[in-house]
Amino acid sequence: MDESIKKLPDLAIADLIFTVKLEGKTGTESYNKLIKEIETHKMLPLYKILVEQLKWTEDQGLVSKLKAENESELKALDNKITDSVENFGESEIREAYLAKSDFYCRIGDKDTAVEMYRQTFEKTVPLGQKLDIVFTLIRMGIFWMDHDIVTRNLEKAQSLVEEGGDWDRKNRLKTYEAVYKMSIRQFKEASDLYLETVASFTSTEFIDYSRFIQYLIFTSLLHLDRVSLKQKVIDSPDVLSVINDTPKLQDLLQSFYNGDYANFFGALAHFSDSIKGDRYLAEHSRFFTREMRILAYNQFLESYSSVKLESMSNQFGVSYDFIDRELSRFVAAGRLNCKIDKVSGVIETTRSDAKNHLYKTTLQQGDNLLNRVQKLSRVINV
């Protein structure tokens, strides 16, 4: 990571907040870590928000300590701005304003930070420095999951990049955009962005590489066809270098691709449960489980014109009743291209609408071509 890029705000703190909210109680290891981070970064505004949201008993001693530290630091920052305005040039004035903006961002005063960054942006000339401010605002928006801040600044960053942003910042923007799109269930767009940036990943101020690869696999499983999944993910040296950092992720990917459905179901259950603790993926856990089951069922059924329910249940390592209920539900919803004969216990596969349309179109085009050949033949004979 470029040393000039600060972890600001520190998104690991947002992860801690999410975990503490899930646990729903104080005194846990996560809670104690969070309080330590709040104290270290002097995050009084954030602490007050959490006290109100989570109904904590306010620690008056901590509040008094953080208030005094914030006031002292703010006074020094204001003095620095005054000194820069009176004695130095535009560059020093900008740096003083940036320091004050970073202060408000760090302590968790979102609204004041946004306003200070706006003022700093107006005093900034170099394109790269403007982009760095916008990137900080995107990270801050994602920290708070403030969709307005994120979307406005993603658009602004895109506009600035089109003016001539450097290669590294263009890639950085794609990573930020990928994570945000994934968080709002735009998985295909996120997958494309992850795959574009995997070989040139540098955004460690935002997300660590192992987690980036986990998200790449998560989105790619949902949207890539088998050939692309093999080429771009399974055989990717970048993916292989860290895939085992996430338990069961390798099993999930390989068992799905290889049609090892019993192991796939076990790995899917483990992975889906683990992402319930991820602030970006938690609300998509059930969706992912359902969609991956549908993909696996369709992949299995593509190999057969008909297959017994009992055979399929054995392949997936589940009971006959489970597979019967599951398939019936997805067939009724139009998600599986098959019919179930309840009497004989047989599944009969059918062409998808897309394949039916292609089949009919091909026949129609063939008929039209045949008619034209016959007409031409009659003309020649005459």
From Swiss-Prot:
Record-annotated PCI domain positions: 186-354
* Molecular function via GO: structural molecule activity
A Pfam match: RPN7
Could you tell me which SUPFAM superfamilies the record lists for this protein?
Answer: TPR-like, Winged helix' DNA-binding domain
List this protein's GO terms for biological process. Answer: proteasome-mediated ubiquitin-dependent protein catabolic process
The answer on whether this UniProt entry bears the keyword Cytoplasm reads: no
Entry GO CC: proteasome complex
Q: Does the keyword Oxidoreductase apply?
A: no
Determine the domain of life of the protein's source: Eukaryota
| Keywords annotated in UniProt | Proteasome
- Cite the PANTHER family for this sequence: 26S PROTEASOME NON-ATPASE REGULATORY SUBUNIT 6 (PTHR14145:SF1), 26S PROTESOME SUBUNIT 6 (PTHR14145)
Give the protein family.
Answer: Belongs to the proteasome subunit S10 family.
State its role: Acts as a regulatory subunit of the 26S proteasome which is involved in the ATP-dependent degradation of ubiquitinated proteins.
The protein's name is: 26S proteasome non-ATPase regulatory subunit 6
| GN (gene name) | psmD6
